[in-house]
From Swiss-Prot:
One MF term in the entry's GO annotations: UDP-N-acetyl-D-glucosamine:N-acetylmuramoyl-L-alanyl-D-glutamyl-meso-2,6-diaminopimelyl-D-alanyl-D-alanine-diphosphoundecaprenol 4-beta-N-acetylglucosaminlytransferase activity
Superkingdom of this protein's organism: Bacteria
Membrane topology: Peripheral membrane protein
Reactions it catalyzes: di-trans,octa-cis-undecaprenyl diphospho-N-acetyl-alpha-D-muramoyl-L-alanyl-D-glutamyl-meso-2,6-diaminopimeloyl-D-alanyl-D-alanine + UDP-N-acetyl-alpha-D-glucosamine = di-trans,octa-cis-undecaprenyl diphospho-[N-acetyl-alpha-D-glucosaminyl-(1->4)]-N-acetyl-alpha-D-muramoyl-L-alanyl-D-glutamyl-meso-2,6-diaminopimeloyl-D-alanyl-D-alanine + UDP + H(+)
Protein name (record): UDP-N-acetylglucosamine--N-acetylmuramyl-(pentapeptide) pyrophosphoryl-undecaprenol N-acetylglucosamine transferase
Organism the protein comes from: Clostridium novyi (strain NT)
């Protein structure tokens, strides 16, 4: 029988889920039973259930900063989710709740507070997301990745921890990566494209438009997002595409020499930890609250990343930038090697241990 019980939450994108998984091995080692609360159709369900973690479903509406007709109905879904989460938490009696943000987390955090269960949350980006802003008053502590984020967290609740990184990412095998990709010319450097868990149409198009030039110099691993595979490119030598990867990811990342990526905090800190030179294409301000732009600028200023605005992206620019990145890769690796950032799993675990009921 487990000594303690923790309920985790977070969803909407993989970035609100995978940091939770980074904590799981250590929590199990300490004797915690782990359960998860998420939505029925969210990406979190697929990820969590594949880890054999007990999964509870609640209702939740999306939290938006812009006008949408659903803004009139979604608050009622959130309210329903609060009562559902409250009931689950009352029944399961966890010692603590850990939230990684995303719209599903708000009713869970409120449900925990209504049951007088302590809550630790984590904010990866430089400026807190709407869900974490709404949840913060109900949390005991809010872990943050960037020092600049602390000024947004009231009541002295902010704790600088960094972002948790899954241990398995450090155990990838380059040999297994090549076996998965079946590249014939192993002398070429490998370029890997990550457009986020949902994919990026603008990155996908720019890469595919530049493909005839890129594959002359690079083998290419393209994670393009669910529903974004291009069947016409399935047999192109030196180019392999996936809609989504899980167990293969550490091996693919070990194989890659260069990356093109969105600038979500989780993925950029993974690239930093693995010392992988990268070209970041943050989500535009029109399509987001601008958090990825701030993340990217911070990494560019530190010399960890090359950055290009989404609006400037095209096949010619992407080819030139990747060639430039490859020529200067040692400079970026040197800068990343001098970084003081490290895996923060132990820091977050110590807070969980301190505040558990």
């Amino acid at each position: 029988m487990s000594k303690y019980k923790i309920i985790m939450t977070g969803g909407g994108s993989a970035g609100h889920v995978t940091p939770n998984l980074a904590l799981v091995p250590k929590l199990k080692e300490l004797g915690y039973e782990i359960q998860y609360i998420g939505t029925e159709n969210g990406i979190e369900r697929k990820i969590i259930e594949s880890e054999n973690i007990k999964y509870h479903i609640i209702s939740s509406g999306k939290l938006r900063r812009y006008f949408d007709i659903k803004n009139f109905s979604d608050p009622f879904k959130v309210l329903k989710g609060v009562f559902e989460a409250k009931k689950i938490i009352k029944r399961e009696k966890p010692n603590i709740v850990f939230s990684k943000g995303g719209f599903v987390s708000v009713p869970v955090v409120i449900g925990a507070r209504l049951n007088r269960i302590p809550v630790i949350s984590h904010e990866s980006d430089m400026t807190p997301g709407l869900a974490n802003k709404l949840a913060a008053p109900f949390c005991n502590k809010v872990c943050v990745t960037f020092p600049e984020t602390l000024k947004y967290i009231k009541d002295n609740k902010g704790v600088l921890t960094g972002t948790p990184i899954r241990e398995e990412l450090f155990k990838g095998s380059k040999i297994k990566g090549y076996e998965i990709c079946k590249f014939k010319d192993t002398t070429k450097p490998v370029l890997m494209i990550i457009g986020g868990s949902l994919g990026s149409k603008v990155i996908n198009k720019s890469v595919r438009d530049a493909l005839s030039n890129l594959i002359k110099k690079y083998n290419i691993i393209h994670i393009c997002g669910k529903g974004n595979l291009d069947e016409s490119l399935q047999n192109v030598e030196g180019y392999v595409q996936f809609d989504y990867v899980k167990d293969e990811l550490p091996h693919l990342m070990a194989t890659a020499d260069l990356f093109i990526s969105r600038a979500g905090a989780n993925v950029i800190f993974e690239l930093l930890a693995l010392k992988k030179p990268n070209l970041l294409v943050p989500l535009s301000a029109k399509a987001s609250r601008g958090d990825q732009i701030l993340n990217a600028k911070s990494f560019e200023k530190s010399g960890y990343s090359m950055v290009i605005e989404e609006e400037s992206l095209n096949s010619e620019v992407i080819t030139n930038k990747i060639d430039e990145l490859f020529k200067e890769k040692q400079k970026y690796i040197k800068n990343m090697n001098s970084s003081s950032a490290n895996n923060c799993v132990d820091k977050i675990i110590s807070l969980i241990e301190k505040y558990k009921k």
